[in-house]
């Protein structure tokens, strides 16, 4: 048996929800039926008190803690999957995650994840909560992630992340021609009807994204972005909110929109790019044990490079026709 502790805060946007429904949104790695069972087994504490009624209403701001024993045979299995290691020492690991690679098992992805790979290559990491995973990247977002190999390292990294002391920068291709950089400061929460989606919501958690223009193409803009917070799908939601969704992001409206008279090469490149154009390109943090300031960069993956080259070639071919 292994004991795990889950903790979270009910969001104001969840006002009026059933407790089991709210927990299912806060802990998407666990099914609603399992969470309901834990509630009924007196394992869920709300503001320090046991609540064992799944239909109990929540109001926002409540502190949730769940302490539960999980059978070993229900824990995640080690799998011999490759990891692209950028840096490693006794305390931390930095990887460059490829596309089509889920970080943590969940509904529909019980195996084949970064976590499964970590358990195989680093068996001792099973003793660290979430196998040392400090932050996540979406399945089809590529780039840098830091992993804690020990509990002290994870505790410090999580604290630094919460205090916004870890710098994460991304490159992206956004739909539309943007004229200047800026900042999106809009709170976010789970979408009220689509549980797997996030949305800008006035009662959500604070979320801040900074962005600047690197390059303009016809119909698209290449961006460098910096996260001040790290909400699920934050960059994708924020860019869609300002009417510039990421190219290829089917969830938030980034369906490819080829420019007028686009070449067949560009058309084919856009058709072949079947994910959001987002890459975690830079990670900077203070080492959790030594305090040394460390920084890593991950080159753009091949499909992203090919996309940029095709957009650039199209722009150069038609630049005499442009008025910007």
Curated annotation (Swiss-Prot):
Catalytic activities: uridine(1911/1915/1917) in 23S rRNA = pseudouridine(1911/1915/1917) in 23S rRNA
Alphabetized PANTHER family for the sequence: MITOCHONDRIAL RNA PSEUDOURIDINE SYNTHASE, RIBOSOMAL LARGE SUBUNIT PSEUDOURIDINE SYNTHASE D
PROSITE patterns, per database record: PSI_RLU (PS01129), S4 (PS50889)
Species assigned in the record: Pasteurella multocida (strain Pm70)
NCBIfam families: PRK11180.1, rluA_subfam
Enzyme class per UniProt: isomerase
Keyword terms: Cytoplasm, Isomerase, RNA-binding, rRNA processing
Functional note: Responsible for synthesis of pseudouridine from uracil at positions 1911, 1915 and 1917 in 23S ribosomal RNA.
GO term, biological process aspect, one: enzyme-directed rRNA pseudouridine synthesis
Domain S4 RNA-binding: 17-90
Active-site residue numbers: 138
Family to which the UniProt record says this protein belongs: Belongs to the pseudouridine synthase RluA family.
Protein name: Ribosomal large subunit pseudouridine synthase D
Entry GO terms, CC: cytoplasm
Subcellular compartments: Cytoplasm
Entry keyword annotation includes Flavoprotein: no
GO molecular function, one term: RNA binding
EC number: 5.4.99.23
Pfam families linked to this entry: PseudoU_synth_2, S4
InterPro entries assigned to the protein according to its UniProt record, in alphabetical order: PsdUridine_synth_cat_dom_sf, PsdUridine_synth_RluA-like_CS, PsdUridine_synth_RluC/D, PsdUridine_synth_RsuA/RluA, RluA_PseudoU_synthase, S4_RNA-bd, S4_RNA-bd_sf
């Amino acid at each position: 048996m292994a004991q795990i502790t889950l903790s979270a805060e009910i969001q104001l946007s969840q006002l009026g929800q059933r407790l089991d429904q709210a927990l299912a949104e806060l802990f998407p790695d666990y099914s609603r039926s399992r969470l309901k069972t834990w509630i009924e087994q007196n394992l869920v504490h709300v503001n320090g008190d046991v609540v064992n009624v799944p239909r109990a209403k929540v109001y926002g701001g409540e502190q949730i803690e769940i302490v539960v024993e999980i059978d070993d045979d229900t824990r995640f299995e080690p799998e011999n999957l490759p990891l692209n290691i950028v840096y490693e020492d006794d305390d931390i690991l930095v990887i460059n995650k490829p596309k089509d690679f889920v970080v943590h098992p969940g509904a529909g992805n019980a195996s084949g994840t970064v976590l499964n790979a970590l358990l195989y290559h680093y068996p001792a990491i099973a003793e660290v909560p979430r196998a040392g995973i400090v932050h996540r990247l979406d399945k089809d977002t590529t780039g840098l992630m830091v992993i804690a190999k020990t509990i002290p390292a994870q505790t410090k990294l999580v604290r630094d992340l919460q205090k916004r002391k870890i710098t994460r920068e991304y490159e992206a291709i956004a739909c539309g021609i943007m004229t200047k950089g800026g900042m999106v400061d809009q709170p976010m929460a789970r979408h009220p009807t689509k549980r797997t989606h996030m949305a800008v919501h006035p009662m959500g958690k604070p979320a801040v994204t900074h962005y600047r223009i690197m390059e303009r193409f016809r119909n698209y803009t290449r961006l460098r972005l910096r996260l001040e917070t790290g909400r699920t799908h934050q960059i994708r939601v924020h860019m869609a909110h300002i009417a510039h969704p990421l190219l290829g992001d089917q969830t938030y409206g980034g369906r490819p929109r080829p420019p007028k008279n686009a070449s067949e090469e560009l058309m084919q490149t856009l058709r072949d790019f079947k994910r959001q154009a987002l890459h975690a390109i830079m990670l900077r943090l203070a080492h959790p044990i030594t305090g040394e300031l460390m920084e890593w960069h991950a080159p753009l993956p091949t499909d992203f490079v090919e996309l940029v080259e095709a957009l650039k070639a199209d722009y150069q071919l038609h630049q005499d026709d442009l008025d910007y």
